[in-house]
């Protein structure tokens, strides 16, 4: 669940930054002058390009963001018996799955938790919590690692990025349709876009983004079942 929350938070943040940046440089005005605010086919194309772009930026930042947000201490050189064992387990499972050995790390959390993230199966990170290390046996920890390695081997983060990109496109599209309606119909603005449009777009984008995240989380839950199966193999 942690990897999904990191991805969704990063994704929404990037969409907001892109939206604000485009507004500041007057990009929306350029679209309007070319009729894109009224041409729904063109608006959908614009939404798809920026929606997929935001999602894949999130994907490529996912490992870095996870390290920062969770405070992951990356293990480059094992310093104790557990870390040596941890690395050996990941190396062995990587060989079985025929993937590049992921970065490994531990983050501070009282509860037993773990996640996998990264831009591809050959550029990934596996992290486990200090609570998991303290409260589980090595056999149990190895099963958890197997679950996360299954996510990596199945390319779940890339597939998730594709789904998130499509969801983003609809969020961008409908937030601008709502903004256009508020600006033209409710606020009766007939000369360019007013401040009401920009605030409406940003607000709608946040709300729709949160609602749409349920689709992503549903998909993630299905992949969790698949990873459970893969981890047990």
Q: Model-predicted segments: where are they?
A:
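Polar-ligand-bearing catalytic/cofactor-coordination segments
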Residues: 1-19, 23, 28-37, 43-199, ...
């Amino acid at each position: 669940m942690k990897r999904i929350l990191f991805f969704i938070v990063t994704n929404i943040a990037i969409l907001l930054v892109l939206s604000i940046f485009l507004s500041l440089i007057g990009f929306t005005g350029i679209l309007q002058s070319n009729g894109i605010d009224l041409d729904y086919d063109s608006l959908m194309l614009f939404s798809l390009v920026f929606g997929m772009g935001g999602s894949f930026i999130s994907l490529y930042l996912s490992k870095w963001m996870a390290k920062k947000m969770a405070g992951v201490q990356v293990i480059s050189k094992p310093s104790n018996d557990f870390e040596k064992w941890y690395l050996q387990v990941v190396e062995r499972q990587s060989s079985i799955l025929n993937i590049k050995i992921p970065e490994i790390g531990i983050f501070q959390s009282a509860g037993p938790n773990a996640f996998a993230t990264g831009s591809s199966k050959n550029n990934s990170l596996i992290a486990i919590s200090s609570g998991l290390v303290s409260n589980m046996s090595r056999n149990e920890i190895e099963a958890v690692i197997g679950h996360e390695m299954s996510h990596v081997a199945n390319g779940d983060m890339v597939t998730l990025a594709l789904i998130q990109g499509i969801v983003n496109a609809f969020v961008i599209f409908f937030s601008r349709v709502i903004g256009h309606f508020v600006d033209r119909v409710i606020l009766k603005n007939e000369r360019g876009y007013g401040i009401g449009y920009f605030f409406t777009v940003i607000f709608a984008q946040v709300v729709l983004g949160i609602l749409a995240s349920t689709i992503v989380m549903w998909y993630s839950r299905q992949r969790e079942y698949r990873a459970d199966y893969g981890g047990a193999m």
